[in-house]
UniProtKB/Swiss-Prot annotation:
One of its GO terms (biological process) is vesicle docking. This is Syntaxin pep12. Belongs to the syntaxin family. The gene is pep12. GO terms for cellular component: endomembrane system; endoplasmic reticulum; fungal-type vacuole membrane; Golgi apparatus; late endosome; SNARE complex.
Length: 263
């Protein structure tokens, strides 16, 4: 499914209060995708194949779902949640998803390379077996021909049968199909990366404005705090001057009263 399909109806903004619930669901999906990616990495390190392709397919479907949900989230306008909070939440989820996708793509590419190397080795071994089988069949035909002419020679048993060769070829074909699926999955991840860049670019201007406003608020708060400190300093100095003036006035009055009493 292309991003264009997901974008249909984008001009019609959803008016509901599902933003927090959907954002929480996306966060859980990203967490699950991160766990799958770690599991795939363990499979590769330990050279395990059981359940590997099931986890790969599950991760592929989960990636598509997260992409779809992020588009839905970008379309939601939740007045209760707030535009700034919504924008920051969407931006964080998008970046988290982008990080997980990059790691998933890396392990998928490694998986495809290992699978390709293994298939190439298996095909080379099969080609050798086919060649050996052909030689043995020719030798058997010669022996049968000699036996029919009265020259008896022991017949050698072929080391590998046609059915075994066909079975090995089917296994190789299946693994080649898995490589094609891996390649398709990697291409789908590239499409998702492009979609994420679109979402990030659309949110970028709003996030920049919000960050600018937050920066201004922080600057204004610091300025206000500084002005308050200056005002407190002036007030303290003014109180000190008033106290000094009062002391001087008391001293003067004391001198005058003393003079009057003594006079």
């Amino acid at each position: 499914m292309s991003f264009v399909d997901l974008e249909q109806g984008r001009h019609k903004i959803e008016q509901n209060g599902d933003f927090p619930a959907l954002a929480s669901s996306i966060a859980q999906e990203i967490h699950a995708l991160r766990g799958n990616t770690a599991a795939i990495h363990r499979y590769l390190v330990n050279n395990l194949t059981k359940n590997l392709h099931e986890v790969l397919e599950q991760s592929r479907e989960l990636s598509q779902k997260v992409r779809s949900d992020l588009v839905r989230l970008a379309n939601i306008k939740d007045t209760k949640y707030g535009e700034e909070a919504s924008s920051f939440a969407l931006s964080k989820l998008t970046r988290d998803f982008n990080t997980v996708l990059a790691e998933l793509q890396r392990v998928q590419q490694k998986c495809a390379q290992q699978e390709s190397d293994s298939v190439a080795a298996a095909q080379a071994a099969l080609n050798q077996d086919v060649g050996q089988h052909f030689i043995e069949e020719e030798e058997r035909n010669v022996s049968l021909s000699n036996n029919s002419s009265g020259q008896r020679q022991p017949l050698t048993e072929s080391k590998i049968s046609n059915s075994q060769l066909e079975y090995q070829q089917r296994l190789i074909n299946e693994r080649q199909g898995e490589i094609e699926n891996l390649t398709q999955g990697i291409n789908e991840l590239n499409e998702i990366f492009r979609d994420l860049s679109t979402i990030i670019n659309e949110q970028g201007e709003l996030v920049t404005n919000i960050e600018y406003n937050v920066g201004n608020t922080s600057t204004n708060t610091k300025n206000a705090s500084r002005q308050l400190q200056i005002a407190n300093e002036h007030s303290r100095k003014a109180r000190k001057r008033s106290f000094c003036f009062l002391v001087i006035l008391v001293v003067i009055l004391g001198v005058i009263l003393t003079a009057l009493i003594m006079g």
